[in-house]
Amino acid sequence: RTGTYKTAFDQNKIDFKDKVVVDVGTGTGILALFAAQAGAKTVYAIEASAIAENAKELVKANGYEEVVKVIQGKVEDVNLPEKVDIIISEPMGFLLVHERMLEVFVHARAKWLKPEGKMFPSTGTIYICPFSDNEIFEEQSLSTSFWDQTNFYGVNLTKAKQKAFDEAFAQPIVGYFSPTMLISNKHVTHVIDFSTVSEKDGLEKIKIPFSFVADKTSIIHGMACWFDVKFFGSQAVVCLSTSPFSPDTHWYQCRLLLQKPIAINETQTVSGEMILTANEYSSYYVDLEMKLNGTNIKSK
């Protein structure tokens, strides 16, 4: 993933040459140094945690202390002496939005970016497609079998079974999967433009309606999700993808399980909506509802 950022910066040096840059959540300062190497005049590297001290050491060791200014503090609290030409960050979490760093990225834009300035990355796209995987479904189901016992040292546990089942199926499955599990060659996308999206209207609640025609007769066990981000530079467009069709990344992919699988025949259609609602745990609640068109069959 780091290499993709380096490529995006180096292939768009015109966007960095003699420009003022903000790095949101700089961490150890790698992206700030990439911006300096691409010719930036000044880079404000902002980091809320104590790792900012490591970033300062790294910047000095690489001879860029005159260019890269490491500032420890939250974006909300930091004041800069000038507006900036480009904002860089690695704000993506699982399913793009987990950790809620996108809101900080967008807040920095509202606070410091010049009207004609750029966001790197520029857009993020969530992809969804129904999948079939009986093995993972059985695995989750079996994880609650402990609560099937009617005589656990004289105690009947079955009353707690449904709650345990609900909790097991409420957890997203984070990991890699084969694209052969997808039941459609098409996917539904939701694009977030970091240059225009607002913290409140665009990121607090994300609604993704969908409709899919099955390419094969199958059992739908849930919804598979992944994302990409694109860097729309003046000289080149660079994409970082977490797709199951692309090389693995540390963001993996996500799968959301239905409690009741849906049997579907080739050419039948399922439709519904996936809703992501921001919560106080720096993440999102995800609600998924799916219906087999032309029937009363539905699941969530």
Which role does the model predict for each range below?
Residues 1-24, 28-300:
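Class I SAM-binding transferase module
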